[in-house]
C-alpha cells in the first residue's frame, strides 16, 4: 500500500508541476503582462508574496514560473517568502494609525517599501484548512499599518493557489477572501489560478 501511495503521490506531484507551467502561462496571458511591455509603457513593479513552507512544493514552483514569465516580459519582480521571514500578526494596537510605522520590529519593514511602490501584488499560497497559510495571512494582516497608502491605490493583484482536492467548491472560501480583500482595497483583479 505504501508503494501505491508513493506512486500516486509522485504522479499527482508531476501532474501538478506540469499543470503549474500551463497555469502560469495562462495567468500571465490573462494578466496581460507580455502585452504591457509591448505597449511601450514602463514595466511594472510586481511583489510576489509566497506562503508555502515547502521550498520544493507545488506552490513555490508555480510562483517561480510566474516570476520567470514576468521577468522575461520585462517586469521588475520582488519575491517575499512569508515563511522564510519573521512577520508577526497585527495586534490591532493602532499605533500606526493605519498610515504610519508599525511598532513591531520584524521583517515586514523589509517588505513595506516594496508594497508601497508595487503596481501589482501576487498572492501565492497553498490551501491550509480552507484558508491562506498562516504566514501569508500574518503579512496580509500587517497591511493595516499601510492601509492609508494602499487602499484606493491603482494597484493590480493576482491569486495563485495550490490545493489537493478535485472539487472547485473547496477553493471558494479562499477565492472569496481574495475578492473581498481586493474589493476593500480597490485593487483590480488580473487573474486567479
Language-model-detected regions and their locations in the chain:
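N-terminal beta-loop-helix "entrance" segment that forms/cooperates
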Residues: 82-100
Amino acid at each position: 500500500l505504501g508503494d501505491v501511495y508513493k506512486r500516486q503521490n509522485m504522479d499527482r506531484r508531476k501532474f501538478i508541476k506540469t499543470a503549474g507551467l500551463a497555469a502560469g502561462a495562462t495567468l500571465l496571458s490573462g494578466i496581460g503582462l507580455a502585452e504591457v511591455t509591448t505597449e511601450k509603457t514602463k514595466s511594472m513593479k510586481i511583489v510576489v508574496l509566497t506562503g508555502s513552507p515547502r521550498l520544493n512544493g507545488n506552490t513555490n514552483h508555480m510562483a517561480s514560473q510566474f516570476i520567470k514569465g514576468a521577468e522575461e516580459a520585462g517586469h521588475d519582480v520582488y519575491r517575499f517568502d512569508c515563511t522564510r521571514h519573521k512577520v508577526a500578526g497585527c495586534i490591532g494596537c493602532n499605533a500606526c494609525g493605519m498610515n504610519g510605522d508599525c511598532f513591531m520590529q520584524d521583517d515586514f519593514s523589509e517588505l513595506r517599501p516594496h508594497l508601497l511602490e508595487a503596481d501589482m501584488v501576487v498572492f501565492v499560497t497553498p490551501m491550509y484548512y480552507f484558508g491562506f497559510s498562516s504566514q501569508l495571512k500574518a503579512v496580509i494582516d500587517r497591511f493595516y499599518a499601510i492601509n492609508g497608502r494602499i487602499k484606493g491605490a491603482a494597484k493590480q493583484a493576482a491569486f495563485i493557489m495550490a490545493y489537493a482536492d478535485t472539487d472547485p467548491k473547496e477553493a471558494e472560501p479562499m477565492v472569496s477572501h481574495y475578492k473581498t480583500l481586493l474589493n476593500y482595497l480597490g485593487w483590480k483583479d488580473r487573474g486567479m489560478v
